[in-house]
A protein has these predicted regions:
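Context-dependent free N-terminus signature
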Residues: 2-3
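Cleavable N-terminal signal peptides of Sec/SRP-targeted secreted and luminal proteins
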Residues: 6-27
Length: 282
């Protein structure tokens, strides 16, 4: 027997209602997940604690004043649910402290006799000052440079080179055509830093995996004396310039920030803070 027109209409109506319900349910789950992500990170680091880390980031003397906000940091972290959410409470706090310490060094405005000390001036800059080049790798066919664009360091992690292309693809923006967005949009800026932190780029592991104790050293790591800890993270970020050197001031600055932040978090730093005896990753 053929279905009546009223039955067909009812079936279509019910199907539409079901699709609408599923779409609404998905949207609510996404919103809840984002709220959970914000509350997860905010339970580790409150606005007050965040501000105590970065005592001078909004000083008029800092070019990035009022750019790096606590709200943007929390919102960016929702895109990376494992950040600050892996392992014990100590490991979680230590990871967040390590991340903020590394980005503080990359954006520091401090000096040895600075007010409140040299490690209270993180997030002072949002882009590299007087870069030596436009950081274009003309041989890279996968991530080709766009004419007239500079791929100098920008954002908390000072994203540079072809990382603009990779980060843009992962986060949904055109990093090669519009690298300036990293220093113009606070949310995108923090997202690029967290993307770098969470993403493995072989032969380098992710900074996240190292700091939460989930990384198992390879044979090459053992041969290069790359020990797991904050020093290996420095090696991942800038080992070619800073590791394997005696008492490097840049490495010490990173460690100084980490020690201060870990203390404010009430956790220890863990072992292997420097990379003096480590060979850089290839």
């Amino acid at each position: 027997m053929a279905a009546s027109s009223s039955s067909v209409s009812l079936l279509i109506s019910c199907s539409f209602c079901l699709l609408s319900f599923l779409a609404l349910s998905s949207a609510l789950q996404t919103a809840a997940s984002r709220r959970d992500g914000r509350s997860r990170i905010s339970s580790l680091i409150s606005q007050q604690l965040f501000d105590s880390f970065f005592l001078h980031k909004d000083d008029p003397a800092c070019p990035a004043n009022n750019f790096y906000t606590y709200a943007s940091f929390l919102q960016a972290s929702t895109s990376f649910p494992k950040f600050g959410n892996t392992g014990s409470q100590v490991r979680r706090r230590r990871e967040v402290a390590a991340f903020l310490a590394q980005v503080s060094h990359e954006t520091t405005g401090g000096w040895p006799t600075a007010p409140d000390g040299p490690f209270a001036w993180g997030l002072c800059f949002k882009e590299e000052v007087s870069p030596q080049s436009d950081y274009c790798d003309s041989t890279n066919k996968q991530w080709p440079c766009y004419p007239g664009r500079s791929y100098k360091g920008r954002g908390p992690i000072q994203l540079s080179n072809f990382n603009y292309g990779q980060a843009g693809k992962a986060l949904g923006f055109d990093g090669l055509r519009n690298p300036e967005i990293v220093s113009n949009n606070s949310l995108v800026s923090f997202k690029t830093a967290l993307w770098f932190w969470m993403t493995e780029q072989k032969p380098k592991p992710s900074c996240h995996k190292v700091m939460v104790g989930r990384y198992v050293r390879t044979r090459d790591d053992l041969a290069a004396n790359r020990t797991v800890g904050f020093g290996m993270v420095t090696n991942i970020i800038n080992g070619g310039l800073e590791c394997g050197l005696p008492n490097d001031g840049r490495v010490n600055d990173r460690i100084g920030y980490f020690q201060r932040y870990a203390n404010l978090f009430g956790v220890d730093t863990g072992p292997n803070l420097d990379c003096q005896y480590q060979k850089p990753f290839n």
